Amino acid sequence: MTIFSVHHATTYRYKRPVRPGQHQLLFRPRDSFDQRLLDCRLTIEPEPVAIRWIHDVFGNCVTLVDFAASTTVLTFDTSIRLEHTPEKSPDFLIEDYARSHPFAYHPEEQPDLLPYMRRHHGDDHAIDEWLARFVTIGASQPTGRLLMTLNEAIAEGFSYQRRTARGTQTPAETLALQQGTCRDFALLMMEAARSLGFAARFITGYVYVPARDGPVRLGGGSTHA
């Protein structure tokens, strides 16, 4: 069992007073069988006129924040403490029917999975051409090995570049540039997996960087897709 403390501060500074619109914050982690939230605090400057909590369609806890006054500085400061009980090693359980690719999801699951199996970006076959370099389309192969091949191809074939600008590159842009951020690589992985018939969607979290028991990890200390 490990206790994690996460402190995340984001500050925006403006040249002239602005009146912030409604902000949607997703910083509260989920409770699960291997994770229990102990404490969660949020401080906002300037003080908002209203704070509301809702759940989105995926069950994520979303904080809606409204402001009444103008400001030149906007700060969100969150502190989280949670108890985490990780597995000693990743244990990726694969149903028997899905151990070899290609496969078909169970009929009762397909209505829920179909939105995540559909490709969301038109790319003039850029993803298909990239996949053809290291994946034999339609040939039977172990599912786990296939997904690891995709993951390794992205890790080895692209360079990580931090980008604070809003938005995500399309998979075609990432393939052309051969570089991107974690969210760009995640989207490329998702679209490639969907091209092969897998259901895929985003998750986000933090990269843990031990302060004294290892070297600094590229991209550590930030949220990641």
Label every model-predicted segment:
Residues 152, 184-225:
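Hydrophobic/aromatic-rich core segments of domains that either
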Residues 1-136, 140:
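Linear, non-domain "peripheral" regions
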Residues 86-89, 162, 193, 197-200:
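Long, hydrophobic, amphipathic alpha-helical segments used as structural scaffolds
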Residues 99-180, 188, 195-196:
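Secondary-structure boundary elements
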Residues 1, 29-38, 155-158, 183-187, ...:
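Short low-complexity stretches enriched in small and charged residues
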Residues 58, 179, 203-204:
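Short glycine-rich loop/turn motifs that provide flexible caps or phosphate-binding loops at active sites
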